[in-house]
Each structure stands twice: as structure tokens, then as C-alpha cells.
């Protein structure tokens, strides 16, 4: 059967495998591509190709990530798998590979392990909306009661981290047996069941263009006789000529009207998510708006200075700091287009943070920035990236 081209008409969903080392994340990733390739819904990617994932740079941080793609009858999936535990942490915190849903892989022979917990917690902190669980290596456990026990324990663990433990789908199987016998109905059944569950349980993401308008301001010009133009890339939503926009962050929020949208020196009726535009703003002076602010649909985003965040601090070998930092550390936080100084408060019982650690912190900025939970940032010292983070909660 000839391999058909992927249908780009299907809804696109980003997923990824998470879980403890050696529980079978990469084997499962390979098995999905192998089993689906029997129906032309994927091209098979070998375990070793996934395992020696290429390195990518995201926000100044090097991360090894493997990408595969496949499709079901209903959807097109992009799937990420990381070779090392540190890569997972970096990936989830930087959002290098945004996940609309996760496949948590747990070996039935071991049950929940430290990295299982850490990945579930991180998924919660960085806002992964849903996950399904693949109980792997079930062929190596003779006692069904033992498998049930592992499942019960995991459902409780999911509850602890505010995932709906009772509702999360669990699929029992063996990724290795499916990988080796993709045509065998019994052995490959767990993969087809997994596909059905991610299709039905992981919600379809809201497309950027359907979300409320937001554009980080990158530059500001005044055009004599016409007014002030703010330029930037529309992050989400649509801005139409004549609509009201708010200028948010750094100083008091101001409302104005967008009287024109241009792109590549042409006038348009609207700017959409992904477009690099100039927005002409009525009655706004050149000095009233600056880089670091955002244009947004009024009432959809507010400026804040205090937040909780999950951070990864670069190791020395990654070009990060050579020494630990302590409570009261004052780096710059790079949000969207600009650096803002902030003060870091470490959690109780943590004296210092070593290069290469990940840590949950509280931070207070010296100027307010438009933000909501899920916003990512780089941590910098004098223009050099020393870490990355994602806001888990707004405090004030």
C-alpha cells in the first residue's frame, strides 16, 4: 500500500511520552509508529533513531528531543519523546514542545517511581491539560491483582496532583511485544486502544487564532499625520481595524482604538495569530507605549508583579552559572520581548539552588508585566541566559 500524505485537514494535536527512566517511553513511541504504519497512518521510526534524538536550542537552552508524527482516523498527532530525564524537565519548562496531552508510561513491574511523580507534578505546573496512562510490561507480571494495585496507586497519585484520577484512561499492554508483532491482533491491540483513548480523552486544543487577541510590542514608530504604530508578532487571536485594544504592562493600562493594520507595507482589514504587523493606535503618543507592553483585547489580561514559577537553572556545562544562588537572588526575567529585574524567594527548607537544578520559586518584579499562568520566560544575567521558567500561579 502506498504511503499517503498526511491529511492536514484533520485537527492537529501535540502529545508526548513522559515517565520514569527505562519504563518504556521510547519503545512505546516506536511501537506506535510501527503498528500504525501497518495501516499507512505513520511511517515507522526505529527505537535507536528516537533514542539518539537531535539537540535543539530553545530560549538559549539545549534540549534533545525526538519528534514523530502519526494519524488516527480523526486527528493528526505530533509526538515528542526525550532521551534523558533532564531533557524532559527542560522541555516541559521551556515549552520547546508544547503538549496538549501526555502519555504517562509506567512499568507494571515497578509501579510509580520518583520520576513518575516528578513528571506528573511538572505536567500539572506547566499546564498540560490531560493525560492517559500506558501500563507497560504487563506481560512480565503474572498476577493480575498486582497490576490492579499499581493502577490504584497511580490513580491516587494523579489525584494528588489534581488530575482526575478516577477518569484518566489506563491502557494495559506491552510496547515491546507490539513493536515486535505489529500485525498480531492481540499484541498490537494495546496500541490501537491507546490511540482510541488519546483521540477521545485528550481535548482538541483551542487554536491560537480563536483565543483573545494579544500582541507583544516589539517596536514603536510615529508616522507624521497618522499617529503611533506598534509593531510585533500577533501571539493569539485576531485584531480588526476599528476594534478597541488595551495597552497592558509596565504602566497603567490604557484603552485605545486600532485604526489601521499593516503588514509588509500593505494595509489590511485584520491581523491574525502568527502575522507580523504594525497596529496604528488612535490618540497614543510615541512615548506612551514601549517594548515590554502588550496590545490585548480589553479585559483579557492584566499586569502583575508577583508569581510562582517552576524553573530550570542551566548547568555550568550548558553555559549557565558556575555557582549556586541563594534567597534574594536578583536576575532579569525575559518575558516575550523584554528583560525585567525581579527578586527570587526560595521555598522553605531550600537554602540554595545549584546549576542544573529545577526548583519552584516565588518572584517579584520591579515593574508589572502582562501575564497569566502558563507564560514562559528566560532567566538572564547581563543578557546571558542562565535558566528558564514557566508561571504556575499569579500571586499579585
Swiss-Prot record:
Positions contributing to Mg(2+) binding: 26
Chain spans, region G5: 174-176
One of the Pfam families matching this protein, by short name: GTP_EFTU_D3
Swiss-Prot/TrEMBL catalytic activity: GTP + H2O = GDP + phosphate + H(+)
Sequence ranges assigned to domain tr-type G in this UniProt record: 10-206
Positions of the UniProt region annotated as G3: 81-84
Keyword Metal-binding in record: yes
GO cellular component: cytosol
Region spans: G2: 60-64
PANTHER family: ELONGATION FACTOR TU, MITOCHONDRIAL, ELONGATION FACTOR TU-RELATED
Function text: GTP hydrolase that promotes the GTP-dependent binding of aminoacyl-tRNA to the A-site of ribosomes during protein biosynthesis.
Assembly with partners or alone: Monomer.
Entry protein name: Elongation factor Tu 1
This protein's encoding gene: tuf1
